[in-house]
Swiss-Prot record:
It catalyses: 2 a quinone + NADPH + H(+) = 2 a 1,4-benzosemiquinone + NADP(+). It comes from Mus musculus (Mouse). This is Quinone oxidoreductase. The modification N6-acetyllysine is found at K23, K186. NADP(+) binds at residues 53, 158-161, 181, 200, 231, 248-251, 271-273.
């Protein structure tokens, strides 16, 4: 190591596998920002299910080893590259993507992936903005083309993306239905924009949703699906004519009957936030900024972990039951 290099604590992954491959190291060199990059002193970093898929080696995208996970960072800019003009040292920011990984005391990010963090939100909330809210925006407006007056079922609404979807959909004039797996989760979903909420652990909850919609032939216009490998077949039976299921999360295969899409001419659409253009990200950020100013963007924080408990966070985000709010690491 060259003399004068600063060191930091960071989670490093040297091999793909279970949560135990997340290793805390205290001698990781603090990266230096290049021309269009900033170095962020991380105060909080969101934990997302996709990070567990990448860590396991089962995801389509495999980072070069070793690597540091983490995208949803909130913190204070420590330094900027020589071509960065929109940000400066000391600015409070959040981002939806990092160059060097967010499970660390410092993280590099490209200057077109970071946004000012308003003083009205703390760093915990900032770490819950990027991927959850941008994914919700893309799912609702890019993938589903949702419109005011339509109905939307958020299937798995008590997590970070689900609650963000409820808030955004309610603010844009949709009738919002949600599901959760606990009484606490149901209450939280109602507090964050849903008109009605159902317990997806009850055997007859699908029938209750159908009754709520009213006309059995009408159905739900849009379903934002967080666990397609369990719910997609039922989703297709809940849709209205021309209805759309947007798949945000899936942990395995599922058998469906394509005939369920034919009579009502329904669609199944996948969503990938990383497919968004820079212009689309700017649109999402503008929508969030307006929501923050008007008060309907209210990130809900769930479980909090110190950096050294990252492996436990990965275990809990997949196997924990009745998750509510956004899971974060605190630094």
């Amino acid at each position: 190591m060259a003399t004068g290099q600063k060191l930091m604590r960071a989670i490093r992954v040297f091999e793909f596998g279970g949560p135990e491959v997340l290793k805390l190291q205290s001698d990781v060199v603090v990266p230096v920002p290049q021309s269009h990059q900033v170095l962020i002193k991380v105060h909080a970093c969101g934990v997302n299910p996709v990070e567990t898929y990448i860590r396991s080696g089962a995801y389509s995208r495999k980072p070069a080893l070793p690597y540091t996970p983490g995208s949803d960072v909130a913190g204070i800019i420590e330094s900027v590259g020589d071509k960065v003009s929109a940000f400066k040292k000391g600015d409070r920011v959040f981002c939806y993507s990092t160059v060097s990984g967010g499970y660390a005391e410092f993280a590099l990010a490209a200057d077109d992936t970071i946004y000012p963090l308003p003083e009205t939100l703390n760093f915990r909330q900032g770490a819950a903005l990027g991927i959850p809210y941008f994914t919700a925006c893309r799912a609702l407006f890019h993938s589903a083309r949702a419109r005011a007056g339509e109905s939307v079922l958020v299937h798995g609404a008590s997590g970070g993306v689900g609650l963000a979807t409820c808030q955004i959909a309610r603010a844009h004039g949709l009738k919002v239905l949600g599901t959760a797996g606990s009484e606490e989760g149901k209450k939280l979903v109602l507090q964050n924009g849903a008109h009605e909420v159902f317990n997806h652990k009850e055997a007859n909850y699908i029938d209750k949703i159908k009754m709520s919609v009213g006309d059995k032939d009408k159905g739900v216009d849009v379903i934002i699906e967080m666990l397609a490998n369990e719910n997609l077949s039922n989703d297709l039976k809940l849709l209205s004519h021309g209805g759309r299921v947007v798949v945000v999360g899936c942990r395995g295969p599922i058998e469906i009957n394509p005939r369920d899409t034919m009579a009502k001419e329904t669609s199944i659409i996948g969503v990938s936030l990383s497919s968004s253009t820079k212009e689309e990200f700017q649109q999402f950020a503008g929508l969030l900024q307006a929501g923050i100013e008007k008060g309907w963007v209210k990130p809900v924080i769930g479980s909090e972990y110190p950096l050294e408990k990252a492996a436990q966070a990965h275990e809990d985000i997949i196997h924990g039951s009745g998750k509510t709010g956004k899971m974060i690491l605190l630094l």
